[in-house]
Amino acid sequence: MGRNGEKQPIILMRKYHFLAAALLCISLQGYAQKPTKGGGISQEMLAQIERNGIQPNDRVISNALAMNKIDDLAMNFKNQHTLDTHFSVETPSQSIHDQKSSGRCWLFSGLNVLRANFARQHKDSIRVEYSQVYLSFYDQLEKANLMLQGVIDCADKPIDDQRVQFFFKNPISDGGTFCGAADLAEKYGVVPMEAMPEPYSAENTSRMAALISSKLREFGLELRKMVAAKKSTRDIQARKTEMLGTVYHMLTVSLGTPVKEFTYTFRDKYGKAVGKPRKFTPKSFYDETVGHPLNGTFVMVMNDPRRPYWKTYEVEYDRHTYDGHNWKYLNLPMEEIAQLAITSLKDSTKMYSSYDVGKQLDRKRGYLAMDNYDYGMLYDTTFPMDKADRISTFDSGSTHAMTLTAVDLDDNGQPVKWKVENSWGPSYGQAGCLIMTNDWFNNFMFRLVVDKKYCSDRVVKAAQQKPLMVMPEDPLFQEDK
């Protein structure tokens, strides 16, 4: 209707509608492309963003998510078939341990490899269970010394220097790598689980670690002041030793005093005693059950598609002991890593390996596959990043170490699926193990420790190159926990 109550011509009304729609379109384009001051969200931007809120078709999913877990709704039901648990190449099974609420997967996996090697040497007639807390104790003491000595070494730098901040931000943790397990076992020996069982604070480390970290930060500031005051090296080292005495006291109260001597009887896999009880020290037990130095016998390989393959890299300060070995690795394509693993498994040798285990993990079945969950369908989007992009953006990286124990090969000798011994207890997953498809293995497997005798001459030679140093802040160089 017109202003005076008269009907407007239909053609004029259509012209008005067309003009209004055109102006609205121009207006929307204008504020959609208009830059905001300082990159913030303006009211116009917010109005545009809010158009992506819940649509009528989303109501069912939104209501379901209000009362259910995301993974339960994103689960691919077609993937809930009965798992094929047959493996064409499999090493002998061994007992599954539980790291509980601690970040010691690297130590559990490392000791799993050592005890499997011992059983293999004795044709599975004798077995041993190593104490994890024994090496955990010295791991924490050594890391405390690494932090304090690192602070001394960098005391001439300002407090906001990147390396200084590295030490104060990460004074101590219970994560690590196989290199740390090797250094600690060689230096302090090993003991059986019966000689030093797990106390509460070994299985629940967060509070103990927080308190020791706080003390180390306090000590670090004191050492910086001593260096600034031109105190002698002798005085500084003497004070550092006193500080480590305090840390040692905190560790003994929490974890118990490390055993120095013990009596032990070896047993077979059925628990029957083999031989008479014998006295051991941690070092003599290492000689008896490991029998040789670990460093120099293995190659750590890694898949990092961001960097050139067949090059060796070393991570600065990524070690457990100040006088130990930095984490050094050879970067290889996944096809090469898979062949190294297959060769080892065919000779009944288990391996330390690490993964981004939280990705696409079916926790109920202990199954890892790329299509376990369809999050894209649930949220009407896609997640297209490849492995290199995920690493570069901190979306993925090595987070958890497990013991590679089996592979299933097709008729052409190509891997179809893999199995690992986990450290989340025997009731988790497949009797304490996880099964993963080869596609998932290629996407989320990162580190593998291989005995040199299973490596080609090319791999051994490449691993001996002078390594390129990389910083511990790199997205990929997280500790296995």
Predicted stretch roles:
Residues 81-154:
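Post-signal peptide N-terminal segment of secreted/secretory-pathway proteins
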Residues 1-35:
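Bacterial Sec-dependent N-terminal signal peptides
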Residues 91-103, 166-172, 323-331, 340-341, ...:
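Second-shell loop/turn segments in exported
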Residues 35-95:
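N-terminal regions that are enriched for targeting/export leaders
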Residues 34-36, 230-481:
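Active-site signature of cysteine proteases
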Residues 132-262:
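Papain-like cysteine protease catalytic cores
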Residues 107, 134-137, 183, 192-195, ...:
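Structural recognition of the beta-strand scaffold that forms the well-ordered cores
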